[in-house]
């Protein structure tokens, strides 16, 4: 992801806590500058970046409000935060405790909006990410959810079967539908698989 962003951005700085990941990025992706550190206290100056991109990470963090406050600190006025996270309503229906053992807290759209606004962001758009027709077919092949099939293997520390590996490798961007949460929308954001928020630092 960071390397794709580097193809259109003047400078990309990635941050990761894991030393092996930092070394991997340094050796494999020369266009990406990578820092070892805590996402809740990034070693960059105040108001030093134009965009913070954070996809599928916040659900793994223990102090989500602090992380979002840190994103606000890093952004210049008018800068944007792009954030995605699994939708708690579809990932862990009927419970506040995540099914995925690697998640600390999952959010629904209202909770994500509240976290962003409480930190001082203005939410520009809240979107739901839905499976398109090809992914719906893959879900059916894997017992109703290709995501649940992956989680089950991870929890069991079991290898992925060849058909699951092949299907995951075959997923393309165009297999997803991103639908804004606006009045009259064809989709209910509470039915989405993931949430995609774009928020602005005033």
Residue ranges and their predicted role:
Residues 125-202:
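A C-terminal cap/extension of S-adenosyl-L-methionine-dependent methyltransferases
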Residues 97-102:
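Short glycine-enriched, charge-decorated loop/helix-capping segments at active-site entrances
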Residues 88, 118-123, 132-133:
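Phosphate/oxyanion-binding loops and surfaces in catalytic or ligand/nucleic-acid-binding neighborhoods
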Residues 104-120, 126:
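Short alpha-helix
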Residues 1-94, 108-113, 197-199:
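Conserved SAM-binding loop
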């Amino acid at each position: 992801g960071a390397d794709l962003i580097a193809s259109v951005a003047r400078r990309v700085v990635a941050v990761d806590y894991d030393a092996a990941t930092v070394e991997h990025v340094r050796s494999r992706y020369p266009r990406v500058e990578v820092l070892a550190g805590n996402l809740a206290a990034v070693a960059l100056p105040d108001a030093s970046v134009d965009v913070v991109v954070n996809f599928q990470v916040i659900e793994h963090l223990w102090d989500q409000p602090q992380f979002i406050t840190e994103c606000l600190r890093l952004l210049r006025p008018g800068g944007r935060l792009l954030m995605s996270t699994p939708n708690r309503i579809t990932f862990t229906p009927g419970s506040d405790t995540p099914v995925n053992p690697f998640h600390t807290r999952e959010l629904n759209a209202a909770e994500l909006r509240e976290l962003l606004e409480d930190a001082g962001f203005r939410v520009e758009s809240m979107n739901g990410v839905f499976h398109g027709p090809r992914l719906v077919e893959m879900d059916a092949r894997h017992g109703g959810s290709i995501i649940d099939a992956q989680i089950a293997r991870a929890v069991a520390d079991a290898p992925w079967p060849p058909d699951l590996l092949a299907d995951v490798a075959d997923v393309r961007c165009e297999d997803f539908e991103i639908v804004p949460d606006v009045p009259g929308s064809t989709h209910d954001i509470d039915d989405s698989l993931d949430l995609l928020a774009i928020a602005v630092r005033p």
